[in-house]
Amino acid sequence: MTVSVGIDKIGFYTPSLYLDMAELATARGEDPNKYLIGIGQSKQAVIPPTQDIVTMAANAASQILTPALKAEVAMVLFGTESGIDNSKASAVYLAHLLGLSPKTRAIEVKQACYGATAGLQLAADYVRVHPQAKVLVIGADVARYGLRTAGEVTQGGGAVAMLVTADPQILTLDMVSSYHTEDVMDFWRPTYRTEALVDGKYSTNVYLDFFKTVWADYQQQTNRTIVDFDAFVFHLPFTKMGRKGLRQILPEAQPDQQKSLKAAFEASQEDNRNVGNLYTGSLYLSLLSLLRHGQLTAGARLGFFSYGSGAEGEFFSGILQPNYQRGFDGAALTTLLAQRKRVSVAEYEDIYRAQLSNDSRDVQLPVGEEVAQYYLAGRQNQQRQYREQ
Ligand code: CAA
């Protein structure tokens, strides 16, 4: 008998600062509605130098790992575009910070915004073969395009942590999925750069084309059609992108279903609208947002479109489980988002420039205002100094 495998728990972390998108629009000489409606973003996470992908991942993972679970994690698969080292995996730093058992396998997975999906599917296959195993999958990034660039409004950052197990509480993954790879230069980041290079309009077109391709292939493989779905969850670099994706397939549904799919989309974009782009974590923040704000019942089939520039697309699906509400702490997430401090555009620009420099100097970061459990205190002897409070 095949074991049912999928997402048992989800944790999420984003730093304690945000920038208001209407304020940014005004500062950049744009109509605020371009950002609020045209792009579909209201707030953007601002990442202080004291947070990086490792600390954000630790802050997300610590929400879902009890001491007993920490001892049981067989593997850590860390999806990220914002790696902090060209050799050593962020998963190794993370495993140490969290106090995981040394009997764990810890690696980093890279393919732009697709890394966490690769991690999730590899984890699911591993658990199908080893049903007792628990795998920690991370999607953590700092989405960084540059001050006064077209991509600036689509920045953000944070981490999603998922525990993949047999008989999961939140979602069982269907075994079938459809994926597609093409060598496309829509978004990339050479190792000498801290900001992505992007052909913005082209990237949005490739996203939509890839969605069309994998959705058609998935339907062919499964004989399922849109009527078999209760909601679609999209990679959301900005919320308008997923809205365009959904619009592409809505005509395949009857009017009643169109209404419910649109309502589910509104729920799925709510939290992303207030955090911004997490690159590889965005799809899974959108899932969390749907679970928090949507009206789904157990047994619902959800469709997922994952996209990572460069480019890789995947469509996969899963079934919502009866106790899905127990798999995440919705109240903690509401508090995390509500307690963030708004920074002005000038403060955001200062913080943007204050990131840990790309050189070998020793640095002590201003950690006095840091409220997160895990943070970065600086760099000594070319080693990042991670701390827990
Ligand atoms: N009121 C309402 N809407 C307005 C408006 C106003 N006053 N002014 C403009 N708009 C609308 C425009 O009509 C447009 O809507 P449509 O796309 O529906 O036509 C929207 O606002 C955006 O306007 P522009 O196209 O003029 O915006 P832009 O040229 O400044 O750039 C962008 C938009 C290309 C997305 C840019 O922000 C960018 O390059 N972002 C980074 C790349 C990106 O996120 N790509 C997504 C796919 S790649 C991916 O998914 C991987 C990843 O995470 C990086």
Give short role names for the model-derived ranges:
Residues 7, 53-113, 223-249:
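Conserved beta-ketoacyl condensing-enzyme motif
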Residues 11-13, 79-84, 111-116, 139-144, ...:
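Acidic, glycine-rich active-site loops and adjacent beta-strand->loop/helix elements
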Residues 31, 53-68, 90, 206-222, ...:
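Short, well-ordered amphipathic alpha-helical segments that serve as non-catalytic structural scaffolds
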Residues 128-161:
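Flexible, glycine-rich active-site loops centered on histidine and acidic residues
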Residues 201-222, 227-246, 250, 271-276:
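A conserved active-site cap/scaffold subdomain adjacent to cofactor or substrate pockets
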